[in-house]
Amino acid sequence: MDSNTVSSFQDILMRMSKMQLGSSSEDLNGMITQLESLKLYRDSLGEAVMRMGDLHSLQSRNEKWREQLSQKFEEIRWLIEEVRHRLKNTENSFEQITFMQALQLLLEVEQEIRTFSFQLI
């Protein structure tokens, strides 16, 4: 993962953690946790691709990796829908910018995970 993506993740997570969205702050914390989890998962897939010999250990260590991959795509789709929903419902420009950048980052992460997974299949 390049340094721009790392700083984008860190910047978005920091800004999202500073948002006060009233009763939905628990939902926002959940989104932040899921975004961090997806980042780690994407990083681990990228590392496995870099060490193609890891493919066999990845498959033998975790026979359900395709199921996990499917679950991660479901999480990404849910997060994308949640971010779009929040983007439509906020009038605060700080929140709009943050959610637009989070949406762009989620789409990039989805594409990277898809690319890595095709290389591993």
From Swiss-Prot:
One GO cellular component term noted in the UniProt record for this chain: host cell nucleus
GO biological process, one term: exit of virus from host cell nucleus through nuclear pore
Motif mapping: Nuclear export signal: 12-21, 85-94
Keyword Transport: yes
Subcellular location: Virion; Host nucleus
Alphabetized Gene3D superfamilies for the sequence: 1.10.287.230, S15/NS1, RNA-binding
UniProt xrefs under SUPFAM superfamilies: Nonstructural protein ns2, Nep, M1-binding domain
Keyword field: Host nucleus, Host-virus interaction, Transport, Virion
Keyword Transport part of the UniProt annotation: yes
Record-linked Pfam families: Flu_NS2 (PF00601)
Primary location class: virion
Quaternary structure, from the entry: Interacts with protein M1. May interact with host nucleoporin RAB/HRB and exportin XPO1/CRM1.
Family, similarity comment: Belongs to the influenza viruses NEP family.
Role summary: Mediates the nuclear export of encapsidated genomic RNAs (ribonucleoproteins, RNPs). Acts as an adapter between viral RNPs complexes and the nuclear export machinery of the cell. Possesses no intrinsic RNA-binding activity, but includes a C-terminal M1-binding domain. This domain is believed to allow recognition of RNPs bound to the protein M1.
Protein name, entry field: Nuclear export protein
Native organism: Influenza A virus (strain A/Equine/New Market/1/1977 H7N7)
Gene that specifies this protein: NS
